[in-house]
Structures are given as structure tokens and as C-alpha cells.
């Protein structure tokens, strides 16, 4: 990253950032594959392939600029199936290059913003998705209504490119990016626009996620502006956001033109207790007041997407429910606000009476069915949750096989350790334990019972059910009050940076 910083500082001296030459740097593709940000719990990271060399990248970009290569009919692809493989190969290589190059200037801007805010030491915790749950535990127990909102996809990839243009002023880079996107759309011209965007997001996940985040960031900028104007409270947690020149220009124009209308409109949005949480393409809006204000914000979202971003969304796709009666899904958890009722006997002089106390608690549950579905997809069990062997790993040593299964168990245990009820998590560990035993038995061409009797692997596999206090006992004494308090309460690991499959499957 230091080399990128020096290169971009030299480019800034020419009053603009030049990203186009970075596409032809071979170490860009090595960095993209060695730092795979989209790694999964169930699948190990892949290494850097030598096919992604500088010479191949130059050839692919030259072919992409050629007119005959840009448009390939469906009949040609049917005649020559090798074209399909080549197109996927071209798309994967150049997409990885685009993604890693376009992230560089924004990472440097974020680093400088964090340094100015003097929070660079806590940057790892800021990046953690688990920092959302302490916020939910602290705020949502005082709220009454919640609305699950799925942010709609843009109707065309050109909208994503237009938003990015206001941040980066490198014309050749955008020519190449637009040619790449139109090349992909022409290749998928026999499908609908929505199907084409969905295909692009699956085949080029990192580039699409980066462009999509900018689209969401623009819509959230307008939302946060109105939310701050309509509330007496200010959102201090967004002080490290990037500066958006285009957004401030729109806001200035909006205030000048509609200043009179704002004085009449904003009182309808007075809601100091509204809370907004968003991860990827899903957001949750919660409030303490009556559903009338929630409906106001609901229609505001609909009109914002339709008028400013040309995205069609139906009002019936946004539901408003009571928190005490509705569970919402976020980040691979099922969450709801549970009412705890307790009765206290009180006595005043000679009179005795009962007082019923109702308290709220955020209940976060491990979703057993989606977890089993993910394990079945990774070939650890069938759709009913019955463990099966993993023959693909049978060529590895016994130690490597056990270590792979233990790594998955540790990741799942850390990810779901903050849940209220862990019975589902113990069942998942049991499935992985039997799958590990069956894999070892398959490798040694034996039955499970004979393998366990011969090798005595039961003691070796006990680590699957290692409790959290055994890990914490390395830090605190076993008889300490802190250790017992941690055992009773749930623990959020705020430095978890990997992505959970269930988060992406929501």
C-alpha cells in the first residue's frame, strides 16, 4: 500500500488521480488474490494464479477494445462453446483488476480521515460487522416499531458508473470500465436487464459490491441530511464519512429552491428516536413513535429511489411491524425484542400488593435451518442435517483434516457467540464433528466405529465442544469473578472481519 500511496501522491501533483496505468501492474492482481476480502467460513481462500500476468491483461484489454470482440451473437456462442469459457475468463481477470485499483484512492482517503479523527487505532473495530449488535442491544429495547427494507438494485449498470464519476476524474479509466460493462451486457443481451445485473454480481462480486456500495452511499447521504434536519439529535458516528462534492452541490441547490417548502415539510418528520441500521443491501428502520411517522419515511424511501435513482420499488415491499411481535433477520441472525415479565410483592404499612414489571431484552437467535442449508451446500451434511463425509479432503493428512474442521467450528463459535440461545450452535458443532469422523474413516477405508476404536480419536475431537471459558481462562484466573460473568453473558468478538455465508444469502 505504501507504493500505491507514493504513486497517487505523484498523480495528485498533476491535479487528478490516474488509475488507468495501475490496470497494467501485475502486482495489482497478486494483491487482489492474496487479500481476498470475500473469503467464506466454509471455503478456504484460493491462491494467486500465474495466468493473471501483465501480458495476459494487455492482450485481454486490446481484444476488448476491438469492435468484433464486443458483440458476439448467441449463435456464435452455441457453435463455439470455448467462447463462453473465454468470456468468463476475461471478465474475471479484468474485474479483479478494476476492483483492486478503484479501491486504492478511497482507502487512502479513509485512512487520512481516520487519522484526522484520531481513531486510527480503533479502525479494526470500526470495520467489524459485529459492532452493530451492541448498538442494537443498547437502542432497540427502547423502540416500538421496526421496518425491514431491502434496498432495490439499480435498473442498469450505467447508474453505478455515473455515481463513481463524481469521485474519480480519470477519463481513460472510465472509458475502459464502461467498455467492460457494456461488453458484459452485450454478452448477456439475451437475458433481461435485471437478470444481467444479477449475473454480473455473481460473476464479478468484488467489483459489483464496490459500485453498489457507492450507489447506497449516495442514497444514504440524502437520507441522513433530511434525518439530521428533521431531528434535534445529530449523528456523530458519521463524522468519518468521505466528503461528497456532488452531494453538497445537490444539497445547496435543494435548500435554495425548496427552502420555503422545507419549513412546512420537516415538521412532519420530527422523530428524534428514529434509528437506521444497514448492512449490504438490507436496512432496518426503527422508531419509538406511532406508525404514522414510519409510513412517512416509507413513502420517502420509495420516492427517493424512483425519482433520484430511477429504481422502481413497490410500497408493499416495506413492512412496518411491532418489535415485540416481529423478528427481523440481519447478519445471519434472527432478532426480536422479548418482553420479560416479573412480579414484585410490595408492602406499605398493613397493605400488601403486587407490582408487575415488564422489561425488554433484545433476543438474538442462531438460525438453525439456514445454517444446515449452508452446511449442505458445502457438502458437510445432507438437506436433513445428517452428517456426511468430505471425500475431497481425504487426500490430506489426518492433522490437516481435523484442523480444517476445527477452524470452521471456531469461526462459527466466534461469530454466533453473542447469541442468546446456543443450542442450535451445539447442533452445528455436532454435525461438523461427525462429518470429520466420517471423512477420516473414509480416508482409512474403515467404518466410523472401527476407526474410533482403532485410533482412539475421541479425545482428539473433544476440541469441537471447547467452551468459551476454557479460552478465557488463558486470560483470567479460573476462579475469577470476571470469568464467571463472561460465562453468563454473551460475548461479541468485535475484531471479526471475515464474511459469513448466511450474511450474503439473506
From Swiss-Prot:
Location of the protein in the cell: Plastid, Chloroplast
InterPro entries in alphabetical order: Domain_X, Maturase_MatK, Maturase_MatK_N
Coiled-coil residue spans: none
Keywords from the UniProt entry: Chloroplast, mRNA processing, Plastid, RNA-binding, tRNA processing
GO molecular function, one term: RNA binding
Keyword Chloroplast attached: yes
Protein known as: Maturase K
Biological source species: Trifolium fragiferum
Gene this chain is encoded by: matK
Amino acid at each position: 500500500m505504501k507504493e500505491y500511496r507514493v504513486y497517487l501522491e505523484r498523480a495528485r501533483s498533476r491535479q487528478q488521480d490516474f488509475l488507468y496505468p495501475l490496470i497494467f501492474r501485475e502486482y495489482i492482481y497478486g494483491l487482489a488474490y492474496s487479500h481476498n476480502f470475500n473469503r467464506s467460513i466454509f471455503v478456504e481462500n484460493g491462491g494467486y494464479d500465474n495466468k493473471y500476468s501483465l501480458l495476459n491483461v494487455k492482450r485481454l484489454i486490446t481484444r476488448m477494445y476491438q469492435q468484433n470482440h464486443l458483440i458476439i451473437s448467441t449463435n456464435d456462442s452455441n457453435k463455439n462453446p470455448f467462447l463462453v469459457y473465454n468470456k468468463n475468463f476475461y471478465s474475471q481477470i479484468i474485474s479483479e483488476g478494476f476492483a483492486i485499483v478503484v479501491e486504492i484512492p478511497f482507502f487512502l482517503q479513509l485512512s487520512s480521515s481516520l487519522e484526522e479523527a484520531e481513531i486510527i487505532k480503533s479502525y479494526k473495530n470500526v470495520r467489524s460487522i459485529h459492532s452493530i449488535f451492541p448498538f442494537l442491544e443498547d437502542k432497540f429495547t427502547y423502540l416500538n416499531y421496526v421496518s425491514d427494507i431491502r434496498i432495490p438494485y439499480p435498473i442498469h449498470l450505467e447508474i453505478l458508473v455515473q455515481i463513481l464519476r463524481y469521485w474519480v476524474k480519470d477519463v481513460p479509466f472510465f472509458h475502459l470500465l464502461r467498455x467492460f460493462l457494456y461488453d458484459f451486457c452485450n454478452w448477456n443481451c439475451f437475458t433481461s436487464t435485471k437478470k444481467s445485473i444479477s449475473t454480473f454480481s455473481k460473476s464479478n462480486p468484488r467489483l459489483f459490491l464496490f459500485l453498489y456500495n457507492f450507489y447506497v452511499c449516495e442514497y444514504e447521504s440524502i437520507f441522513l441530511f433530511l434525518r439530521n434536519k428533521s431531528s434535534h439529535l445529530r449523528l456523530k458516528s458519521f463524522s468519518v464519512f468521505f466528503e461528497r462534492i456532488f452531494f453538497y452541490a445537490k444539497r445547496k441547490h435543494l435548500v435554495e429552491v425548496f427552502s420555503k417548502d422545507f419549513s412546512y415539510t420537516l415538521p412532519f418528520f420530527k422523530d428524534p428516536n428514529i434509528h437506521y441500521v444497514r448492512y449490504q443491501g438490507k436496512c432496518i428502520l426503527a422508531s419509538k413513535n406511532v406508525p404514522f411517522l414510519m409510513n412517512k419515511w416509507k413513502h420517502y424511501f420509495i420516492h427517493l429511489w424512483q425519482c433520484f435513482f430511477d429504481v422502481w420499488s413497490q410500497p408493499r415491499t416495506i413492512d412496518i411491524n411491532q418489535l415485540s411481535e416481529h423478528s427481523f433477520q440481519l447478519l445471519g441472525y434472527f432478532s426480536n425484542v422479548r418482553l420479560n415479565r416479573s412480579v414484585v410483592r410490595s408492602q406499605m404499612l398493613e397493605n400488601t400488593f403486587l407490582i408487575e414489571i415488564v422489561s425488554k431484552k433484545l433476543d438474538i437467535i442462531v438460525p438453525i435451518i439456514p445454517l444446515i442449508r449452508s452446511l449442505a451446500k458445502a457438502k458437510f451434511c445432507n438437506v436433513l442435517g445428517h452428517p456426511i463425509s468430505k471425500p475431497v479432503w481425504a487426500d490430506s493428512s489426518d492433522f490437516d483434516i481435523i484442523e480444517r474442521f476445527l477452524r470452521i467450528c471456531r469461526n462459527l463459535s466466534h461469530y454466533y457467540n453473542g447469541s442468546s440461545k446456543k443450542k442450535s450452535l451445539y447442533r452445528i458443532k455436532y454435525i461438523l464433528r461427525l462429518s470429520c469422523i466420517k471423512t477420516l474413516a473414509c480416508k482409512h477405508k474403515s467404518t466410523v466405529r472401527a476407526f474410533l476404536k482403532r485410533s482412539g480419536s475421541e479425545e482428539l475431537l473433544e476440541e469441537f465442544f471447547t467452551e468459551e471459558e476454557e479460552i478465557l481462562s488463558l486470560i483470567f484466573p479460573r476462579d475469577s469473578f470476571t470469568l464467571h460473568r463472561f460465562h453468563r453473558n454473551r460475548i461479541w468478538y468485535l475484531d471479526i472481519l471475515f464474511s459469513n455465508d448466511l450474511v450474503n444469502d439473506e
